[in-house]
Amino acid sequence: MSEDDNARRQPTLAARLRAGEKLVSAWSGLPDPLVAEMLARLGFDAVTLDMQHGFHSTESVLRGIAGVALAGKPAIVRIPVGRFDMASRALDMGASAVIAPMINDVEDARAFAAAMKFPPLGERSWGPHRAVQLSRHEDVSTFMRTADRETLSFAMIETRKAFDRLNDILDVDGIDGVFVGPADFSIAWSEGAQVDPGLKEMMPAIEAIAAAAEKNGKLAAIFAADPGRAGRYRQMGYRLVATASDTESLVLGAATLLERAKAG
């Protein structure tokens, strides 16, 4: 059985998260599809391609999703701020989930959801030809019927404004979950005094976000700049933790090898 055939038989990312599995995604900022594919071939459950602060473009996302799929894993795409058109394009390219940054109110959430879901739930237009090729479905009718359920929309919660409107955002039809960005959240929580993804004062709020998602029947995801925090986030109720950026992995790996070479 090929990796592609095996991937088609595996539960979707959405199904695994909704079943309560705790998953870990790698984080890809480098636009070379081979890097994303190599990360996917490790033990990560998914690979996130970052267009906001990473260096991914439309072309590299197209190729990166294919590389991740070739390794039998689902791809997640973080779009730039306000680029909801790119959310639809990422889905057309075969993304299993899209993360939208700076969703601060219901209007933002509705616009994002509209781009992510087909009518009548949303306004996504038809054109997922590449996604159909990469999917487990053999015909477009089945794909159409299942797409809204099998692809996930994560609204990023990064500001006090978003936190204050959290339940309203979670209540929007077509928003499947929230994704916390602890770095930006720490800036907001400290009123611009510091950037500290591990800021102790904001941890009760971070935990409250996961609890609110659970209460509303939605998913909670978060970025862990320090992989050592992943376990704590899982205990809070976060089902998806993204970590291990490719740039940091490259630097740490090279530094370790250099140290060993000099020691020998």
Language model features with spans:
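N-terminal amphipathic alpha-helix/helix-capping segment at the start of soluble metabolic enzymes
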Residues: 1-25, 29, 137-149, 206-209, ...
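Hydrophobic faces of well-ordered beta-strands that scaffold small-molecule active sites
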Residues: 22-28, 47-49, 75-79, 98-100, ...
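Glycine-rich, proline-tolerant flexible connector loops at the mouths of alpha/beta enzymes
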Residues: 35-63, 182-198
